Amino acid sequence: MTLESLRRDIDRIDARILSLLDERLEKGLLTRRHKSGSLDSGREAEVLGRVSARSRCLADEAFTTGLYRRIMDESKAIQDRRLSLIGFQGMHGAYGEAAARAWAPEAATMPFGEFSQVFDAVLAGDVDYGIVPVENTLGGVVGQVNSILVTTELRVAGAVDMAVSHCLLAPPGADHRELRTVYSHGQALSQCRRFIERNGLEGVDWFDTAGAARMIAEERPKGAAAIASRFAAELYGLEIIKDGIQDSPNNRTRFFVLAKEARQATNGPADGDHGRAGDHGRAGDHGKAGDKCSAVFFADDKAGALFAVLEVFAEAGINLTRIESVPTEPGDYAIFIDFAGSDRDEAVIKALDRAG
């Protein structure tokens, strides 16, 4: 045991404390939806009593109870701000969270383990919005998300198209020449394969890019790094050894922002009969060149069903950029389409009415 090793241990503990503090404040923010106000004196007394009973000899009781009073005061202050809440899949620092912050910088972001949990949280009113990836230029459509989109009653309130730039991250001061192992999600590892092989690194599959970054920040395994976003590096205090290490520069992900109701800036979902269709252009870009709309139609599994939908858009002179059919149940299909245009264009409105 040396001074250096003890300080490394302290750094790891500090990182965990900060992560747990953030998690506690998030849970407090979620409770705001289930009570009439931020102040609950009975609950506060219960928490302080439990803290007092569990105080250990190294931590004075007055210190621990005072600390928790400050934490609860901060929690109440955050709740009183009545922030919009956006749920995303993954851990803090995930690309989904970066997309959420790009769409609504003032909102609070809430992590969920599964895509389905994001949908459920919006439906339950626990969060105002959910953001999910629907398509990646390298990996194609996100099948799990599209399968849920077919059946959900949520509306798409907006979209974010984001460049995905992978970074090699390590603890500050780490010697990059000593790096031997790199942790990340399997998809990120595959997208950076040439860089990994060229530098003689061993890729280790992790459940999440942001999770890998957090592990490196908290555990600091010797000779190890993570592949994650610049956002994750800033969040976990990691050093960016190398930016843009993905094999292909054309790596972009499109995200949908989900809500119970479409935002006022939009005209509602493209398939108004079902209340669950596409994105109506990037938020704030309606009616401008470069708008991109998405819609989903439901059709029987019979000859000519797909052609009937596509013919409408061809006759209207609307350029389709994506066509995909997904089976929903025996004999039925959902047809996903993306097309250039705005949901405020007269030609688009008429085409959607005819196709729907």
Segments from the language model and where they lie:
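Domain-level signature for soluble enzymes in the chorismate/prephenate branch of the shikimate pathway
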Residues: M1-G356
